[in-house]
């Protein structure tokens, strides 16, 4: 059933709740926890049989500055430094008001989850993700998005939030003053139930699962594998457009250039940041891997067959095995062992004439850090200023990967309080959006994505939206 707007108020016989939240991923769950901490009742409406969403499919890593756990790790950081990193990655095209709001809100939100709700966080050690100037990536000890969702759901339920699963919201009810009066949602038997509310938060993510919208707005990803949650159907944007709400950054998205194929598993970009390289079917490097895994998706898809090989050595393998997603991919047969360059060339399928020379590029590039243009045996040259810490040493390990679309970074335009904006820049009285349903802080292109921006927007946005709703309810809307 298509998302639609219904003018009026749901039947008076329908249950009433102060706050309804569409989506029980990280954004919705954090908002619910924050609302319950303030004593406000809320209901999360989740389309799936249990909370999951894009968060559960992610690595679950959340960037945050100046948290208690980061300080204990001896890392000096600040919201201002984090904001500078965000804008540098986005070439200063990210929405300034959201960069400031999120970089300031995420640390306190993470500390509250740990101190008040017993969600343990660690700071990842040993490497930096592209664009981050210090170690600020937080994770639950399991280092998976699924484990993060489990902890957030536990905390939300313990705080007294209600989570209604198998409830796909298809209707937003609105009065003549554009005030949200309730929602309609489809149950497993195709019946439609209604819920009246005083405020509504859209935490239902983006449009990556909507093939038509992807083809229109993200043509580079038209034929890419979608590795996100299928519930990302663009409902929030459809509702917003029907209400004449503004949208922003709809060409922004997070891709990933290291999706193991055919296993269908995410391979951490930490392997590239620690000295790994990507080679195409001709044995050629074709981009600077340290620029970011999001834009790497486009580079990989542009290679012969739309695939590449992520190549690394034993020292990097040790780091890789600290990530559960990698271990699952390895168990599924994604990791190939190559005793020397000739075996690696045979695996990749390089032309026999060039195989040894091409694979020698692994050593050549790790030895040269001069930033000069280099020619790949007749291919176009490009400037590569990547500085390697050391040379890769045999045996080599290789994983066949493709580029994938993970989630979109554009959506409904919002102010710093996560209130949805109309075309005239005024805010709807009681409609809020955050996380993937709203514009993020990655600007309007794939290269603007700083690692962790998705969960930054979800967690910080969820906390901010909840606090905005708390103030709205105090004012009786």
Per-region residue spans from a language model:
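N-terminal Rossmann-like FAD-binding beta1-loop-alpha1 element of flavoenzymes
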Residues: 19-44
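An anion/pyrophosphate-binding glycine-rich loop and adjacent beta-alpha core
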Residues: 237-241, 246-356
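Glycine-rich loop(s) and the adjacent beta-strand/alpha-helix scaffold that form part
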Residues: 188-191, 195-260, 455-464
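Extreme N-terminal leader/targeting segments of oxidoreductases
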Residues: 1-19, 37, 471-474
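C-terminal structured subdomain/cap of oxidoreductase catalytic cores
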Residues: 45, 326-328, 410-477
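Conserved N-terminal/central alpha/beta ligand/cofactor-binding core
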Residues: 4-11, 47-162, 168, 279, ...
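A glycine-rich dinucleotide-binding beta-alpha-beta segment and adjacent secondary-structure elements
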Residues: 171, 357-441, 445
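Helical element adjacent to the flavin cofactor pocket in flavoenzyme catalytic cores
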Residues: 140-194, 198, 243
């Amino acid at each position: 059933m298509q998302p639609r707007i219904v003018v009026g108020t749901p039947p008076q016989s329908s249950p009433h709740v102060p706050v309804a939240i569409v989506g029980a991923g990280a954004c919705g769950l954090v908002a619910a926890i924050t609302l319950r901490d303030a004593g406000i009742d809320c209901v999360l409406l989740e389309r799936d049989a249990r909370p999951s969403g894009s968060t559960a499919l992610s690595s679950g890593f959340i960037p945050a500055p100046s948290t208690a756990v980061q300080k204990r790790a001896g890392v000096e950081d600040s919201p201002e430094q984090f904001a500078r990193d965000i804008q540098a990655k986005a070439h200063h095209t990210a929405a300034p008001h959201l960069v400031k709001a999120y970089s300031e809100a995420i640390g306190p939100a993470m500390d509250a989850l740990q101190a008040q709700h017993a969600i343990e966080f660690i700071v990842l050690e040993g490497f930096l993700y592209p664009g981050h100037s210090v170690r600020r990536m937080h994770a639950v000890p399991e280092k998976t998005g699924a484990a993060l969702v489990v902890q957030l759901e536990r905390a939300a339920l313990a705080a007294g939030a209600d989570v209604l699963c198998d409830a796909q919201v298809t209707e937003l009810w609105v009065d003549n003053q554009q005030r949200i009066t309730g929602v309609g949602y489809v149950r497993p038997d195709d019946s439609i139930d209604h819920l009246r509310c005083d405020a509504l938060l859209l935490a239902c993510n983006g449009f990556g699962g909507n093939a038509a919208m992807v083809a229109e707005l993200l043509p580079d990803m038209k034929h890419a594998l979608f590795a996100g949650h299928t519930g990302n159907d663009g409902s929030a944007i459809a509702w917003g457009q029907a209400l004449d709400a503004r949208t922003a950054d709809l060409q922004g998205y997070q891709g990933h250039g290291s999706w193991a194929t055919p296993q269908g598993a995410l391979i951490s970009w930490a392997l590239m940041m620690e000295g790994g390289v990507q080679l195409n079917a001709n044995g050629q490097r074709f981009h600077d891997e340290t620029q970011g895994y999001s834009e790497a998706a486009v580079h990989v898809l542009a290679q012969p067959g739309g695939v590449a090989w992520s190549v690394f050595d034993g020292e990097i393998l040790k780091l890789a095995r600290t990530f559960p997603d990698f271990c699952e991919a390895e168990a599924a047969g994604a990791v190939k062992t190559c005793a020397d360059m000739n075996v690696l060339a045979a695996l990749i399928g390089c032309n026999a004439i060039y195989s040894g020379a091409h694979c020698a590029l692994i050593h050549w590039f790790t030895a040269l850090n001069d930033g000069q243009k280099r020619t790949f045996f007749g291919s176009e040259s490009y400037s590569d200023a990547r500085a390697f810490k050391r040379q890769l040493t045999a045996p080599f390990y290789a994983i066949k990967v493709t580029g994938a679309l993970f989630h979109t970074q554009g959506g409904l335009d919002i102010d710093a309080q996560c209130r949805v904006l109309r075309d005239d820049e005024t805010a709807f009285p009681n409609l809020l959006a955050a996380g993937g349903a709203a514009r993020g802080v990655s600007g309007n292109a794939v290269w603007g994505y700083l690692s962790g921006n998705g969960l930054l927007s979800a967690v910080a946005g969820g906390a901010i939206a909840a606090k905005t709703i708390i103030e709205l309810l105090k004012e009786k809307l």
